[in-house]
């Protein structure tokens, strides 16, 4: 029963009366009380992000479920989008560039490895002005005329000089073997005209299909392959596969045959003797030669993908 005894105006209820009123409210609710929801400020940041993501997913689930019932409307909606729904996709290494599409760029860094969309990539937009237009015909012409521009290819040729010294192999014979794979020269030419990146090139025998593999070593702690560079390399080198990998914190692009491929009849042969004679006039930088010696020692144990 309730206490109906009169009390003086302005007096406060006693502690017993206050407890009785609280108990009566809890009993009326039929449970021990209403649990207060934790405020967002009390949740960790990752929990708040997860809550927001779940809220957005529930918000748009019905819309996309309805679109899935009518493929024509779904395609029309996608075509009308001016900004991609997903701008990056994480990948794992080793990663084959054959898995890319025409507009994909590749970013490798300590923060992760992911494919981007060239049209929405700030790095690709910044590098557009530095990209030279290189067709397969232009690459073949550069390969045939390299004796006239041999100094421009000294970074590529210096690696062969170091490799010949390491294995006590005649440089002219090694040069003849690599000239038998013009695609390796194409990769060097494409990357050399591809912007600020200044990669190094290592040559290793291919135990599977013969010839040589090319390791493209990227300097620094990150690497970015412009979507046009990827497209040009894949187009210029049919029959070759490209795999991005990392070895001892250094990013590398491995270029190797994917089958026993005969010489391309469209590409004229180049005299190794003429190139060798011209190379003897080049004074290779001592720092570059030491760098190649260190890189070969580092990648001797690297298992190519």
Curated annotation (Swiss-Prot):
Plays an essential role in virion nuclear egress, the first step of virion release from infected cell. Within the host nucleus, NEC1 interacts with the newly formed capsid through the vertexes and directs it to the inner nuclear membrane by associating with NEC2. Induces the budding of the capsid at the inner nuclear membrane as well as its envelopment into the perinuclear space. GO terms for molecular function: zinc ion binding. This is Nuclear egress protein 1. The lineage of its organism: Viruses, Duplodnaviria, Heunggongvirae, Peploviricota, Herviviricetes. InterPro entries: Herpes_UL31 (IPR021152). The gene is NEC1. It holds the Pfam family Herpes_UL31. It comes from Human herpesvirus 2 (strain HG52). A zinc finger (CCCH-type) spans 105-224. Belongs to the herpesviridae NEC1 protein family.
């Amino acid at each position: 029963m309730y206490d109906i005894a009169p009390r003086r105006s302005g007096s406060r209820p006693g502690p017993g009366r206050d407890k009785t009123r609280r108990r009566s409210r809890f009993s009326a609710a039929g449970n021990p009380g209403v649990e207060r929801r934790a405020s967002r400020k009390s949740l960790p940041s990752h929990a708040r992000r997860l809550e927001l993501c779940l809220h957005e997913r529930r918000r748009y689930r019905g819309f996309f479920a309805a679109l899935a019932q009518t493929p024509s409307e779904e395609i029309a909606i996608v075509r009308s989008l001016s900004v991609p729904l997903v701008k990056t996709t994480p990948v794992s290494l080793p990663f084959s560039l054959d898995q890319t599409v025409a507009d994909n760029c590749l970013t490798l860094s300590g923060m992760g490895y992911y494919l981007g969309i060239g049209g929405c990539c700030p790095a690709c937009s910044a590098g557009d002005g530095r990209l030279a237009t290189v067709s397969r015909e232009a690459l073949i012409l550069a390969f045939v005329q390299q004796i006239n521009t041999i100094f421009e290819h000294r970074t590529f040729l210096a690696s062969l000089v170091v490799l010949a010294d390491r294995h006590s192999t005649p440089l002219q014979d090694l040069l003849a073997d690599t000239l038998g794979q013009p695609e390796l020269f194409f990769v060097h030419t494409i990357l050399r005209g591809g912007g600020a990146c200044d990669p190094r090139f290592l040559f290793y025998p291919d135990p599977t299909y013969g010839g040589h593999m090319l390791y493209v070593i990227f300097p620094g702690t990150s690497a970015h392959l412009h979507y046009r560079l990827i497209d040009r390399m894949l187009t210029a080198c049919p029959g070759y596969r490209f795999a991005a990998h990392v070895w001892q914190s250094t990013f590398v692009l491995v270029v190797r045959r994917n089958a026993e491929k005969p010489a391309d009849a469209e590409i004229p042969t180049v005299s190794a003797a003429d190139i060798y004679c011209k190379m003897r006039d080049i004074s290779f930088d001592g720092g570059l030669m030491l760098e190649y010696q260190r890189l070969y020692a580092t990648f001797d144990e690297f298992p190519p993908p």
